[in-house]
């Protein structure tokens, strides 16, 4: 324990001796503590201006004076959190070093004197004091009295004290005199080889009477301190007036270390007697500062520390000025006021689709421009919809047509933590609007400031219930800052003061989260929901994007592109058109055509770039197994055959052996269509529509069943690894057929259980209805399943098919109905009967036309892909038709 205490004391003592290289009083308080230990070197090196050796807890680094201020400003001055010091952190002496750091921190605390130095005059005085103290401690005034160039002598002196020199290859260098003079013809010519105007030659002749005495000493060494810039010059000892020899960087006595510092190899291993005989070591008595020009002295010595300190304080003052400016203008908001879009004029002709909306907005823009016709028009529009559907583009076109300023702000600009800042920004915004009206204000992402105030309403309801029990107490509700901003917006939009010649357009992606107060007429008179474009709109949008190209596009290709780009919004279509033009240009250049041509292959490659794909198999030939090629060919051929014959199914444009994943937006629309979410869709479509949909979805699985008739275990659940809506989609459609009563069944009359009639389940009338439903469903289900009961018990693939692909026991039965659990299971059996019937019909139809199915599958295997024209030619050659009448016909 005593030994540890002594080691800590010695460590603190060493730091104390070297800590005041820069006076602690002059270190600004904003700098953190610098716990550094200057490397124990000769005093000569310690007084050098150009180099400071800093040792931060056993870490030796070579830095300049500017680096000292850098190291003092970091948050971790000791480097304890640095990755390169992780090994040191695991040292056994870690606790001792932590204690030493705490002790040093208590001893060397930054002085608070700098806190009063807030004005520039005080900073100049302190800077001057620092410069004077620094150069006085380093003996600069002794070398340059009265700013005259007086040169210190180049002195050789013996080192008698062993503590004056510690041999360390990282900061010192000793070189044998005989090695330095090997290139000379004679050692005696050293004095004569020096230039006549060299101060070194004059000093050597004046201080050392007999030069031959030094030359004849075989083991004499010269100690050269590093850090003077000598090691970085091309001819090291020819730097300035030190013309001892021409030892260059490529010499054998010079080596490079990791941090790219050039040092001289002392070669101490070859001369072990040097460390013992200190009398044979010569070193410089003082720094040989040899400058002859006063401007050079000022620039190189005096202005260096002055610039460092001035920069540090100036940086602090500039930072304060920036903070003041930010505090002064914190309530201001940047508004881009554009009278007309001349550079990039956007008109309604540049927007495809939405003809009725464009006509209405064009009328409002005309009324803004010509006030003589009418002063009554919608004062606000709320644009809602997914991103990329043209909300901002429509607002820009409206402002250009009206020739009015277009003000664009973001809703997030009015969400601030500081109290009152957001309200000040709202006031500043509408004050600027009064000066430039009539104008159009476009608020993007308005849901960030117009969220529904549900929390405050809940608190009010709770306080109303307990308000009577609290007498004489003030009840306050803390509102969020966004609520106060919303209230201020509501007042400016339609409050006590009238809003003149200002149309506010708000855009949001989440209209369901908006507050009811901001959506009422008078604030937002019209609420318009933007959706992905339909077929005709996509065709119009692609026409606009491709109108300025020289590529040839026929009408059939345009129709095909509009049909196959389902699910893409306006931004996606613009990107699709750009990729089509790029690929067509590359193809025409490769084929040396003057005019590019846009065909189906170009569209397919462009669509692959636009589509967001989750799963891609790079090499299908390596990934596919033995039966995968045949399974894929028959699966795609069955889908192509059924979809070609049934009018309600989506047409197949091409069949490929290696199916590519669909884009995400296409799949989202497919999921929504297959779910049949509302009765509106059912009212426009009869039972035949849904029956054809189910048959088309089960066609691929039925074709695989024909191929693997004797190997039912090889049948796949789905092939498209991204998402296959076939199996789950067929179950969803059958579920809604039964749920909405499209069949001759009583089950569609009873819908989901409501919370109001939950207590009426035990009512006698409800019990009679449940019994009636149970008997009806049981009779119908048994009648439909009678012809499949034997096959279901024999074939193994039926068990594989139903248990894995139709999890009705996990999803359907969880929903609450007012009938009993037994009747709900019968409803599930009715869904099963629909799927059994339609799957069996699809299987029988493809089995009866197995020759046509084999023909299509062979073409897919041979050509890897077939087009829609080839499919129609093959199907029409066989003259096959499929009945598309009613459910009873199936």
Curated annotation (Swiss-Prot):
GO cellular component, one term: chloroplast stroma
UniProt xrefs under PROSITE patterns: AAA
Single GO MF annotation: ATP hydrolysis activity
tRNA-binding found in the keyword field: no
InterPro entries assigned to the protein according to its UniProt record, in alphabetical order: AAA+_ATPase, ATPase_AAA_core, ATPase_AAA_CS, P-loop_NTPase, Peptidase_M41, Peptidase_M41-like
Pfam families to which the protein is assigned, alphabetical: AAA, Peptidase_M41
GO BP terms: protein catabolic process; proteolysis
Keyword ATP-binding: yes
Localization, UniProt: Plastid, Chloroplast stroma
Record-linked SMART domains: AAA (SM00382)
Major localisation: plastid
More details: The protein in this organism is about half the size it is in other chloroplasts.
PANTHER family on file: ATP-DEPENDENT ZINC METALLOPROTEASE YME1L1, METALLOPROTEASE M41 FTSH
Record function comment: Probable ATPase of unknown function. Its presence in a non-photosynthetic plant (Epifagus virginiana) and experiments in tobacco indicate that it has an essential function which is probably not related to photosynthesis.
Family from the record: Belongs to the Ycf2 family.
Name of the molecule in the record: Protein Ycf2
Species this protein is from: Mesostigma viride (Green alga)
Gene symbol of the encoding locus: ycf2
